[in-house]
């Protein structure tokens, strides 16, 4: 979309933060209004993360107005809320390409702009990185300031508290801004806090505070009285005790939609020494009523008509794999009251909404706490229950030690339902489920299954749920199922694949949901096609049979080739001294960028045409 200067006259004056800082303060509320409307206009046309950015417009304007970015370093946690930041930092006219192949990255990305200090996508990393950046800036000695913006969801993760605990110890000069969009505060309390925040962050108060500490440092009772008086004044209206105890100077909560008030407070806090904490209250979806009322639905949106106030309904076609999992979960829970389901803040994405409503006493959303989720599941298993951890492939990485140390070593029967395995599409490098087979396959006695369709997915979930000799995992992709008939649930024989088609000379060993394309290739090349089903334990007898009866083997998986299922096949052949040629097809040794799943599979040669071309070139 082209930028309409007439529609956004103030925003038209701002294509960089230098231009932003030339505007008079009085024009900033109008700029915020135009920025919010432009965000609505552009994202509704292109798709993308939506509600979070609407809530951070004033904060973004205020931060770039007060701080000398990019010299001063601004770090966004996760990045869902950073669209206004991108618009104000030279990417205004490209915002319509966000999350598209070759377009703007969906999150702040160091390779895209000097304003993007930290590449992000996963949560709760900003404060840790910010401390390191602040320490480096202090050693550099150029008076460079550091600001981290983190949301109320991300700050609940243990990593954020580990970082704040460290900051309180080494006391770097930095500001943490908590963007709190979960609570609401009355106008009176909000006004009082705004006024108090400006007083408490001002130079006069800060100098008196430090001076008082020095004067009365030798008089412990008076020093303690002053401390308690300050805490009492703050405690009447603010919930900052925790952050103060961690060593931060806490200011807030303040109205995050009052751009002029934010500027005053930020200017006051900019030159304060030590770790500072500003708590702002915002409304997710601010300025677009449907998103304000339902911020979860409008968190990330497809293309839609803003005038309709609703998102387009799905076509009513095939169910997603997440839906298949959710239905199986409810079906199984109705028959077994030992089932417990756990998610780290991904209820909607993992297909668990219905389960959470039907079985609230057996549903646990542990927030953004993947490590805790896995060890919590271990505890449930020790207590005699049957825990299922529903988690995205990319987020399971964050709990690897817990899988290994707290579950696998103890041979606990925890089932991992790994969603978004393989290529996920528009979220790019940080969210591709490229590595789970590689990092799980090396764990002793772990059972790993890769369904080729939705019926196999259900059977594998059932098999894993009833496997009691240790942990098991079923990995399935983002997107819709293929439309096969769902048969009654039954346990699969562990570690056994099945031959789907008999051919000559070439055998294709398929792992997972690339099966439809692999089947087309097998038909075209008259190759044998095997649905391996299990990555661990591998069906060694079937692999050796294929090696003995064919001239060459091809393995197919939507996982990194290095350490993946194909590597496992290679290991089996080498261990048995079977020098048959093997071509491993999978994800290459680089981080897969954004694009639709179809676009990226075609580019990487993981669709039928690409696979066939690779095989023919290899055989030539």
UniProtKB/Swiss-Prot annotation:
InterPro entries tied to this protein: Dxylulose-5-P_synthase (IPR005477), THDP-binding (IPR029061), Transketo_C/PFOR_II (IPR009014), Transketolase-like_Pyr-bd (IPR005475), Transketolase_BS (IPR020826), Transketolase_C (IPR033248), Transketolase_CS (IPR049557)
Record-linked CDD domains: TPP_DXS, TPP_PYR_DXS_TK_like
Binding, thiamine diphosphate: 80, 121-123, 153-154, 181, 288, 370
GO molecular function: 1-deoxy-D-xylulose-5-phosphate synthase activity; magnesium ion binding; thiamine pyrophosphate binding
Keyword Ribosomal protein recorded: no
Protein origin, superkingdom: Bacteria
Catalysed transformations (reactions): D-glyceraldehyde 3-phosphate + pyruvate + H(+) = 1-deoxy-D-xylulose 5-phosphate + CO2
Entry keyword annotation includes Transferase: yes
GO biological process: 1-deoxy-D-xylulose 5-phosphate biosynthetic process; isopentenyl diphosphate biosynthetic process, methylerythritol 4-phosphate pathway; terpenoid biosynthetic process; thiamine biosynthetic process
Annotated binding of Mg(2+), by residue: 152, 181
Cofactor note as given: Binds 1 Mg(2+) ion per subunit. Binds 1 thiamine pyrophosphate per subunit.
UniProt keyword annotations, A-Z: Isoprene biosynthesis, Magnesium, Metal-binding, Thiamine biosynthesis, Thiamine pyrophosphate, Transferase
One Gene Ontology CC term in the entry: cytosol
UniProt-listed Pfam families: DXP_synthase_N, Transket_pyr, Transketolase_C
Family statement: Belongs to the transketolase family. DXPS subfamily.
Stated name of the protein: 1-deoxy-D-xylulose-5-phosphate synthase
Gene: dxs
